[in-house]
From Swiss-Prot:
It is found in: Mitochondrion. This is Lipoyl synthase, mitochondrial. It comes from Leishmania major. One of its GO terms (cellular component) is mitochondrion. [4Fe-4S] cluster 2 binds at residues 157, 161, 164. Residues 140-362 form the Radical SAM core domain. Gene3D superfamilies: Aldolase class I (3.20.20.70).
């Protein structure tokens, strides 16, 4: 039936109303079509003008290539290096996850995983869903150094940072008194010369688990005396006496992550952690050990920070005496965690690495896939530690010579 056709039993008034409605609908459709046509014309005009503007631009800063490569003579900045992409969009091409290779390619990967399973130990590599697990566990190349980050005091954390995928619990299971021996044995079986040991926060324990961590460190070093050991630890409620207990253990590197810039810390980290408390922890380690302990921290990008804030965070860490720093891209581990605000371009990470080294950091690893323990045992940082050990050995030898000379004179 035609839309304007009206049954004979309908009154003339109703028929007239129906005709008006039909006419109105047709005019509305016509109006929408006219608007769409005009919008399309305006769009074409805008695109033509925009293309002409790009062609006539002499600065080199307003073309698409400038998002990837900066024009010569233009200083890099976080804003000029690359576009912002939000978490709901596809990952940019520079975010690539490395799939772990099999036994024939990375026998160390399987050996580390098997050792962890047999001793019922946790690794932050697995619990935090680190994208670099294949590279670190298997070594960065055929001759690379395999590195694993063992997580002590269980797999449940008492804090609930909004970026972290580690399980949380107000009342985690009790500590395993055999864990120090298990960890030491696992490290020995791995056959590595550098290991990272981290911890879950245990606010349910009076000392935050500091004594247990110290026991693990001493046991590991006793069974593996030549091992270089990095401990990535919490803030222990801000209790500096507990920090001192760890600082005097035979550690090679004392690491504590500041995580993000100060402004967004309250919405990113658990309320019991704070930016200033983390800085105080790192600074106290440096002062307590007279600068002899190498300290390290890490910053995530992509949480809503500004360029000036990242720069200030680097300055704050350096002022606190931190010697090594890592910067990496935050990736949302699950839909319940914070969303990514942007994906920083690799050029931006290169910029931060240069600025960090210019500020006086001894070591900086900066890249989209870098994490706090990423390639922790790589050559450069190991070389720093060996140089420090040699210097300390030289001082000890000189002191012994002076004592012997004094005895001979007496």
């Amino acid at each position: 039936m035609c839309p304007t056709a009206v049954p004979s039993r309908v009154s003339p008034v109703a028929a007239a109303a129906a005709a008006d409605i039909a006419g109105s609908s047709e005019s509305t459709v016509s109006l929408v079509a006219d608007v769409d046509k005009k919008n399309s014309q305006y769009k074409q005009i805008f695109l033509e003008r925009f293309r002409k503007k790009l062609q006539s631009d002499k600065t080199g800063m307003n073309n698409l290539e400038s998002f990837v490569e900066l024009p010569e003579g233009v200083a890099p900045s976080a804003a000029s290096i690359g576009p912002i992409k939000r978490g709901s969009e596809p990952l940019p091409p520079w975010i690539k996850l490395k799939v772990p290779k099999g036994m024939t390619h990375r026998p160390r990967f399987n050996r580390i995983r098997r050792s962890m399973r047999e001793k019922n130990l946790s690794t932050v590599c697995e619990e935090a869903k680190c994208p670099n697990i294949g590279e670190c566990w298997g070594g960065s190349d055929e001759e690379g150094t395999a590195t694993a980050t063992i997580m002590v005091m269980g797999s449940h954390c008492t804090r609930g940072c909004r970026f972290c995928s580690v399980l949380t619990s107000r009342r985690p299971p009790p500590l395993d008194p055999e864990e120090p021996e298990k960890v030491a044995a696992a490290v020995h079986e791995m056959g590595v010369d550098y290991i990272v040991m981290t911890m879950v926060d245990r606010d349910d324990l009076p000392d935050g688990g500091a004594s247990h961590v110290c026991c693990c460190i001493h046991t590991i070093k006793k069974k593996n005396p030549e091992l270089m050991l990095e401990a990535l630890v919490g803030d222990f409620h801000g209790d500096l006496k507990l920090v001192e207990q760890l600082a005097v253990t035979p550690l090679s590197v004392y690491a504590h992550n500041i995580e993000c810039v100060e402004r967004i810390t309250p919405r990113v980290r658990d309320r019991r952690a704070s930016y200033r408390q983390s800085l105080q922890t790192l600074e106290h380690v440096t002062k307590w050990t007279n600068g002899n302990m190498l300290t390290k921290s890490s910053i995530m990008l992509g949480l809503g920070e500004e360029e000036a804030e990242v720069r200030q965070t680097l300055r704050d860490l350096r002022t606190a005496g931190v010697s090594a720093v890592t910067l990496g891209q935050y990736l949302q581990p699950s839909h319940t965690r914070l969303k990514v605000s942007r994906y920083a371009h690799p050029k931006e990470f290169e910029m931060w690495e240069k600025e960090a080294m210019d500020m006086g950091f001894l070591y900086c690893a900066s890249g989209p896939m870098v994490r706090s323990s990423y390639r922790a045992g790589e050559y450069y940082i190991k070389n720093i530690l060996k140089q420090r050990q040699s210097a300390e050995g030289g001082k000890a030898a000189a002191a012994a010579t002076a004592v012997n000379a004094g005895t001979a004179i007496a």
